[in-house]
From Swiss-Prot:
One of its GO terms (biological process) is urea catabolic process. Keywords: Chaperone, Cytoplasm, GTP-binding, Nickel insertion, Nucleotide-binding. InterPro entries: CobW/HypB/UreG_nucleotide-bd, P-loop_NTPase, UreG. It is found in: Cytoplasm. Homodimer. UreD, UreF and UreG form a complex that acts as a GTP-hydrolysis-dependent molecular chaperone, activating the urease apoprotein by helping to assemble the nickel containing metallocenter of UreC. The UreE protein probably delivers the nickel. Facilitates the functional incorporation of the urease nickel metallocenter. This process requires GTP hydrolysis, probably effectuated by UreG. The gene is ureG. This is Urease accessory protein UreG.
């Protein structure tokens, strides 16, 4: 049985769903961010989620047990290899998962795709994701933003998570913000970044607002036109 989101009525689909990729190293908070996004946006949008793990479906289990979405709206994918391959070089396993999910939920507004934990070079194929969010955590070290890599420099939104841990690991949030600003400034301006503490929901509203704005979404009864779609 496919679980509807009953509070969303009379929806008129205009476009395919927005596909939002969430990447980052192991333990950075990708699954927790996805949980918070689902809980914060499910009253306005029809959501489904795809999670990636190498050998298990642990993230699918965690999302299901947290009540982020009904169980049948969360699909776990076992990549069985290097995580970035399944989101970049050969995204077919995830593209197939999206197709299968949309057969069951054709009115979905947003498909979240969470990658398996990977390094700073991981990026989503444009065939798989319309928007990319890359998550790091403060505990990994103050130096991470200035190391660069596609996740830091090219993602549509860069998230620096676990800001509450900064005093305990000797990290300066001001330094991390300055380094991030330098690494994400292009000829077109500064690409956005957000600092979050998901334990207190700090920064979550900013992430949701970014998805709505950049993804050209509108709460209510209909999806609207989006850039390039």
């Amino acid at each position: 049985m496919n679980t509807p989101l009953h509070h969303i009525k009379n929806r008129t689909k205009i476009l395919p769903p927005l596909r939002v990729g969430i990447g980052g190293p192991v333990g950075s908070g990708k699954t927790t961010l996805l949980e918070m996004l689902c809980k914060g946006m499910r009253e306005r949008y029809d959501l489904v989620a795809i999670t990636n793990d190498i050998y298990t479906k642990e993230d699918q289990r965690l999302l299901t047990e947290s009540g982020a979405l009904p169980a049948d709206r969360i699909m776990g994918v076992e990549t069985g290899g290097c995580p970035h391959t399944a989101i970049r070089e050969d995204a077919s396993i995830n593209l197939e998962a999206i197709d299968r999910m949309l057969v069951d939920f054709p009115d979905a507004d947003i498909v979240f795709i969470e990658s398996g934990g990977d390094n700073l070079a991981a990026t989503f194929s444009p065939e798989l994701s319309d928007l990319t969010i890359y998550v790091i955590d403060v505990a990994a070290g103050e130096k991470i933003p200035r190391k660069g890599g596609p996740g830091i420099t090219k993602s549509d939104l860069f998230v620096i998570n676990k800001t509450d841990l900064a005093p305990y690991v000797g990290a300066s949030l001001d330094v991390m913000a300055a380094d991030t600003t330098r690494m994400r400034t292009t000829v077109k301006g500064l690409k956005p970044f957000v600092m979050t503490n998901l334990k207190t929901l700090s920064g979550v509203q900013e992430v949701m607002a970014f998805i709505e704005s950049k993804g050209m979404l509108r709460s209510g009864d209909a999806a609207t036109l989006r850039d390039g779609r």
